[in-house]
Amino acid sequence: MFVLHSYSKLPNINEYAKAKSTPLDVFVWGTGSMCELGLGPSAKNKEVKRPRLNPYLTEEKLGGTKIVDFAVGGMHTLALDGKNRIWSWGGNDSEVLGRDTCQAKEVLKDIDGKNGNDDDDDDEDGDLNEAESTPALVENLPEGEIVQLAATDNLSAALLSNGDVYSWGCFRCNEGLLGFLRDEIKLQKTPLKIKELKKHCPIMRSVKIILLALDSKEWMPGVNGQQYQLGRRILERHRYRSLEPQQFGLYNIKYIASGDFHCFAIDHSHNVYAWGLNQYGQCALTGDNGELEDGSVLMKPTLIPELSHKGIKEIAAGEHHTLALTEDGQVYAWGRYDMKEIGIPKDKLPKSTFKINTGTHGSFSFLQNLFAVKIKTIGVGSHHSFAVTEDGVVYAWGFAETYGPGLGPSIDDVEKPTRIVNTATKNEDILLIGAGGQFSVSGGVKFEDEEKAEVRLDKYEDLE
């Protein structure tokens, strides 16, 4: 059993997960107006324009251990340390942090002399909630080895080595709160064992979706299916059934991935399937000339010929765009283009690029490799993207107004993959990367030999 994140390597779905053990330095950047960066309550930490080492997650602060894995949701992050503890930080309106943060909110009110009705409560220059903005331990976790984590917009989950799944938070739909488990629990504040998911694998991080597979069959629990993310139709009168795991017709599956409103699966014959929203071609299925219908949707898992048998081992999907990484280190991108999500300059777009009604380049589906160097992992936020080279250098592109790419003070969207250059990560081999709506997180290992880092720097400067 295993949990699969958007930055994970392709596993064998029949193998049991093993907890990661490599100690990581954790870096954060972007906009943290909802406490997403985990840098503490000071207002000056709301915007970080390049990767910054999180001082609360160092070996000293964690009592002689480091973070070994993390999962990034829309506005929060979960991090697993070497002592089998989960740390959380970020917005907690949906109880995704798995711990009480209400007391800190009350303290802030008392200090400021405010109440919940004051217009000044949303002052952008004020300090953040200390309990939400500072990493702290998830409460009431069970005994047992935690092997992987998952985080979405409004939900958190942890997988144990014995196959148990614990979760907390909620699911939301277009109208607001949908619930947590059937119609019985609306908000779950601390980890709860999900009995229906015993021996299920894997869990995949997405904004609104958790995908699971049992014996290589696809299952979908706890999802708003209004955009057909479930791969099946949900009638309004049975809406709470979307909060129950149900098989929906895919077999022999070895890999799954999901974006905000679309999903992918790869079977053991290397066929790739997609379903969900496709109005920007994010499912990699368009007409012969790249045309798309407004509101295009794949209502059930659909074979995607252009992606099948390409050796794809990893898929990372955002709100309306998708990246894929192949076994030989190539990266493909497709989907929405108007915020530069796919990393291809405008003058390099093929004629088949579809334009939305405004005349803006809306979607792109033709597959071409983005890099001349080998890539080892990929990651995406809602509208920005990352690729990490085999020696740990990060390239970023996409929507930059909230500094999600980590490339500095410019708020101009980044049209093509651009190398992150800063002091904090200069000597780091980045191993993991993930992102939410307006922030990003990476984890790396520092080179013992600084000369090796200098050689790497010279290599990429020569390439550029």
UniProtKB/Swiss-Prot annotation:
SUPFAM superfamilies to which the protein is assigned, alphabetical: RCC1/BLIP-II
InterPro entries: Ran_GTPase-activating, RCC1/BLIP-II, Reg_chr_condens
Region forming the signal peptide: none
Keyword Metal-binding: no
One MF term in the entry's GO annotations: guanyl-nucleotide exchange factor activity
Region listing for Disordered, in residue ranges: 111-130
GO BP term (any one): poly(A)+ mRNA export from nucleus
Main subcellular localisation: nucleus
GO cellular component: chromatin; cytoplasm; nucleus
RCC1 repeats: 23-82, 84-135, 162-216, 269-327, 329-390, 391-445
Segments of skewed composition (Acidic residues): 118-130
Pfam family, one: WD40_RLD
Keyword presence, Repeat: yes
Subcellular location: Nucleus
Keywords linked to the UniProt accession: Cell cycle, Cell division, Guanine-nucleotide releasing factor, Mitosis, Nucleus, Repeat
Function: Promotes the exchange of Ran(SPI1)-bound GDP by GTP. Involved in the control of mitosis. Regulates a variety of nuclear events, including mitotic check-point, chromosome decondensation and mRNA processing/transport.
Full protein name: Protein RCC1
Organism whose genome encodes this protein: Candida albicans (Yeast)
